[in-house]
Amino acid sequence: MKRIIGDGEFSGTGEISRPSMSKFEKYFEIKKITDEHSLKKSFSLRHKVYCEELGYEPIRESGLEYDEYDTRAVHLCVIHKKSGIFAGTVRLVFDSDQQELPFRRLLKNFKENVEDINVARLKKNRMCEVSRLAVPTEFRKRKLDDKLKLNFSSEEIKCFPMISMALFYGCLTYCKHYEIGAYSMMEERLARALKISGIESFRVADFHEFNGLRAPFLFSSSFNTEKIRPEQLRILNYVYNSVIEKEKTITAA
């Protein structure tokens, strides 16, 4: 397994490869949210997905879905370049002395001993949870109705499955860069799908019914680049440069 991250590009061979544009990069932008306007768009998208489409949360008059964890979270979004539409969003919730991570509170409701989940051995400065990943229905479907087909080319539609993957790449490159451990409450099929994309994790507690059977998974601190297809590597490079390299530039300014 090659474990590579840093300046330049990821490569399955362990070498710095020449930059090449992914199809995803051609049509979509990924970025860390740093302004209130974009954050409200993220909350609006979450309301559309979690409240209106899936019914996981109650409908709110404001049309915004947010909670007490958002004030101590880093938010990422994917934007469709041509239209400016938010195609996906996700957050990284950080732990604190005052408030535990969302999944730990959930497990306590199921009377599971969360103290058995020992994170000290990870030697991480902090821990976080990947949550509230939201991709609206028009970007989740591979087969669109005639009306939506007028808005997207066939090549753009082929990129739709990459949106969720790019958001996970963004979260985990951020965590690796800042030496933060990351959990997520996931269905087993999502954990398997992420593994194919080079994102490995292991389950740290039992499955429970929570909008489907889900369990907390702890992500590996490295990407398994030998399992990633060339197009996925290009997306990973693009995400790293968009999220981490851009943050380095802002910090240095």
Tell where the protein language model's regions lie, with residue ranges:
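An N-terminal domain-start capping segment
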Residues: 1, 86-105
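Short acidic N-proximal helix/loop "leader" segments that mark the beginning
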Residues: 1-25
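Short amphipathic alpha-helix that is part of the acyltransferase structural core
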Residues: 16-64, 71, 75-82, 86, ...
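Beta-rich nucleic-acid/ligand-interaction surfaces
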Residues: 62-69, 189-193
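A short beta-turn/loop motif at secondary-structure boundaries
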Residues: 65-70, 207-211
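Short loop segments at secondary-structure junctions
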Residues: 81-83, 138, 220-225
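Acyl-donor binding region in acyl/amide transferases
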Residues: 97-218
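Accessory, usually C-terminal, subdomains that scaffold auxiliary metal cofactors
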Residues: 198-252
